[in-house]
Amino acid sequence: MKAAQFFLYSLLFFASAALSSANIAEFDEYWQKKSKVAQAKAKKAYTPHPEEVTNHFNKAVHSSFEGNSTRRNLRTNKLGQCLATNPIDRCWRCKKNWSANRKDLVKCVKGFGRKTTGGAAGEIYVVTDPSDDSLTDPKFGTLRWGVIQDRPLWIIFGKSMVIRLKQELIINNDKTIDGRGANVQIAGGAQLTVQFVHNVIIHGIHIHDIKPGEGGLIRDSEKHSGIRTRSDGDGISIIGSSNIWIDHVSLARCSDGLIDVILGSTAITISNCHLTEHDDVMLLGASDTYTQDEIMQVTVAFNHFGRGLVQRMPRCRYGFVHVVNNDYTHWIMYAVGGSQHPTIISQGNRYIAPHIEAAKEVTKRDYAEPAEWSKWTWKSQGDLFVSGAFFVESGGPFENKYSKKDLIKAKPGTFVQRLTRFSGALNCKENMEC
């Protein structure tokens, strides 16, 4: 009996170790230290009162539709005026000098990732070379050289380019990848990996047709290279990281997920993205046994879940997920799902059900009987349901948990098409409103 218990414990231990060192073949002293620092940063980034963050976000959305300035920003585009239809975009898009003040973007983030500053404390680094020839000694001018630096950098692109990554691109702390002003495509190669780091912004790029990388020796900082196992082929993989903002990114056709957020990642905002042509779209929490995902807090806002999508928009485990003012125009199986009692607050989204009669339900609970999942807090507030779509709620009244400081609701689902109309990477020109 004791031998059997020991064997089972050993299996669980090694499974947990393998999970916590995702894609790292040799979990050496460098990665062990980096993992501990990342965990400490994540705990610090976690907010014990997530309702206050949702209230702050809702107030910003509400304010963006008030006053004369709003009417100017929502006017028709017949004369070429700038249209900025949600509070994140209103913060920067209609300023002609955005390219001279790129770092002002950090003032615009909302939701759980609102404290993210990326590389704002560092220099601007210009990518001029789309090649990815060396994984251990990347050339100056390449994207890989920029993201592995140990200091903050605001990374921009000197021209439009297609970058085919030979292996996963491992992004270091305090980085912004800012594609505004160029057509930047990460395509046909390996994924972007944000692992055991903090303070990263990815903005204004296209990511598509991503394949698994075979692994091998890859540099992940100025001072360290390590052996990596096979990467999954996600578009963006966020592993054990905090203070992350993904904004105005277009994603399609990746081998695994478009965006995965796993292993205790938290303080994350995914906003203004356009997601298309994919099955498993967005995974928030990868394992039912990884209870550390309890600290996961993610805002999913102003995104367009578009043509060719099947499921997981997102699929959640544990944690707290605020799904607000997104446009769900396509799914085949379901839109929002989960297991292991995540809290999911759906506010002001538009859900357009497919013509498949069995797929009208927005929600899907996995691996739990109704007696169990009926206790999970899944709430729909102000959502718009089209073509027979419906959201199965559960849990007690979430309103009782709200902070009394701000009880302003998100804009209802009828506003969503306007709020998300400029999702995905934008065609920004320098010295012009974007």
UniProtKB/Swiss-Prot annotation:
Ca(2+) binds at D232, D256, D260. Keywords: Calcium, Glycoprotein, Lyase, Metal-binding, Signal. It comes from the Eukaryota. Its EC number is 4.2.2.2. Its cofactor is Ca(2+). It is an enzyme of class 4 (lyase). Pathway: Glycan metabolism; pectin degradation; 2-dehydro-3-deoxy-D-gluconate from pectin: step 2/5. One of its GO terms (molecular function) is pectate lyase activity. InterPro entries: AmbAllergen, Pec_lyase, Pec_lyase_N, Pectin_lyas_fold, Pectin_lyase_fold/virulence, PEL. This is Pectate lyase. The lineage of its organism: Eukaryota, Viridiplantae, Streptophyta, Embryophyta, Tracheophyta.
